[in-house]
């Protein structure tokens, strides 16, 4: 089976959680060896390759491209595609995690005008470099940044 699946990743699931769930479902659909032979003589079904093109942070929801079988060989092709992000923003506060889940470190009633918001948004059009938050799925020395941050480690991520 060679497929590309478009999955709406639920909040609090990691991208790997989605891959593992899809892999489990696909394995359960494989025909089982119903032989009355001994367990040692049963033939294991072939492994199913399942991967994803891109990672979403655990708190993010949205489209996750799941690749099955030979489609996994085209991961780089999917990773190079343009992406569009839709966000919801709460103005007037910051948190220690850079998201709505963390402890509020600053709260203000001084909300910018719609015109100020529009001018600020213009700074984010085109190719830009940003520093991802410490509580993100980016890997640092093989570990997810959010896991390091939750463990109290100082997480330094370079602009991308």
Label every PLM stretch briefly:
Residues 1-160:
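Catalytic/RNA-binding core of pseudouridine synthases
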């Amino acid at each position: 089976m060679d497929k590309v699946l478009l999955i709406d990743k639920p909040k609090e699931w990691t991208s790997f959680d989605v891959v593992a769930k899809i892999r489990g479902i696909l394995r359960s659909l494989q025909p089982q060896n119903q032989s009355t032979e001994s367990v040692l003589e049963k033939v294991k079904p072939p492994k199913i390759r399942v991967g994803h093109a891109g990672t979403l942070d655990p708190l993010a929801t949205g489209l996750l491209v799941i690749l099955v079988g030979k489609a996994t060989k085209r991961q780089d092709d999917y990773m190079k595609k343009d992406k569009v992000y839709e966000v919801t923003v709460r103005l007037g506060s910051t948190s220690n995690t850079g998201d709505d889940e963390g402890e509020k470190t600053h709260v203000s009633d001084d909300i910018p005008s719609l015109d100020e918001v529009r001018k600020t948004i213009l700074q984010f059009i085109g190719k830009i470099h940003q520093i991802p938050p410490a509580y993100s799925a980016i890997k640092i020395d093989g570990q997810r940044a959010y896991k390091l941050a939750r463990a109290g480690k100082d997480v330094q991520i370079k602009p991308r």
